[in-house]
Regions:
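Extended catalytic cores of very large enzyme megasubunits
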Residues: 1-212
Length: 212
């Protein structure tokens, strides 16, 4: 299959591993890595089947698989494109606490660091103006806390936007840009502000916002 120039550029900038000269090298690298964890008696067949699937785009692997599978030095990256986070997973009885919120923010940072996309329903965060027992003040609300997620995403991916003259061997020219999905349920008191948030230029620009 003859690739268009724009397709070659996308491959070079996003998916080509060091020392790979052509797209078929990328396909072989993925097939070998996928087969490497199989039972020895099945490795060759799995390799051949996977290679056939990839060759000439009979099928195509996800972006993180294509970019990272079988590449030395990228063991800390993910092979999944997107993650949906559940606040209940952190184990706090009162997840809507400063401890719970910042633990969820840490989980977001680790997900983006590994190049995964991030999604979460933020409805569990109490709305702005609610009294915080034991502190004597009121909560800043969902949108204020979402700004922390925004800053975290921008900070983690900022290095990938810096133009440098020297690319270390094995270093990517591009990484994922901190993609996030933020959801708020229709019943939440801040839903109108949530809907209008992106009318302000530069606000929550790392988010795709959806009403649940």
């Amino acid at each position: 299959m003859q690739l268009q120039e724009v397709s070659k550029e996308v491959w070079r900038d996003n998916y080509k591993a060091p020392k790979e000269k052509k797209l078929s090298d990328t396909w072989e690298r993925q097939a070998k890595a996928a087969a490497s964890v199989e039972n020895p008696s099945k490795k060759q067949q799995i390799y051949e089947d996977f290679l056939w699937l990839l060759t000439d785009f009979h099928g195509i692997a996800g972006g993180r698989i294509t970019a990272n599978l079988g590449v030395e030095g990228r063991e800390a990256t993910t092979l999944f494109n997107c993650y949906v986070h559940n606040p209940a997973d952190i184990g706090y009885k009162d997840v809507d606490s400063i401890h719970g919120i910042y633990d969820m923010l840490k989980a977001q940072a680790l997900t983006l660091k590994s190049e995964g996309g991030y999604g979460m329903n933020f409805s569990w965060i109490r709305p702005a103006g609610m009294y915080v027992a034991g502190i004597g003040s009121r909560t800043p609300g969902v949108l204020a806390f979402m700004e922390l997620w925004e800053i975290s995403s921008k900070t983690i991916t900022r290095g990938s936007e810096k133009i440098i003259d020297y690319i270390r061997e094995g270093e990517k020219k591009k990484i994922r840009k901190g993609a996030q999905m933020g959801i708020l349920e229709i019943w939440h008191p801040e839903i109108e502000d949530f809907i209008e948030a992106k009318l302000t230029k530069g606000r929550l620009e790392k988010f795709n916002l959806s009403v649940g």
